[in-house]
Amino acid sequence: MPYSQFRLEQIKSEFGITLSEQFGLFAEIPEATYSPFLSETLEYNIPLALAINSEKSRSEMIVAPILIELRKQFDNRIGLFSGKDFTVDSLRGLNGFCDFLISKSPEQLIIEAPIIALVEAKII
């Protein structure tokens, strides 16, 4: 089953995941600075992406520029992948294509563990 078909309740029961909802979890982390290029890009892209009103537009025009900026801020020490097959365990339904993957490895040819984030640009 592709990742997009999982529901939160199912993930909790099948994989023994515990949810922890905490207010202010990142409150102590200082605000990140970002480049003028990202600011200008988002200033133009966000209204356009919202007007187009699709997952693809939000993914390409909002999420991708932010993740590229993140990679730049880490001096390319993290891997960034888009639209890649990420089959972990097909028997347990852990397979499919992810909008974005971030890896702790700077390797760009192969997705290497650990994967530190999965990002999906979903319509809610």
Residue ranges, per PLM feature:
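Terminal, non-catalytic protein-protein interaction segments that mediate quaternary/complex assembly
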Residues: 22-25
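A short, conserved, highly charged catalytic patch centered on acidic carboxylates
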Residues: 2, 11, 17-20, 31-124
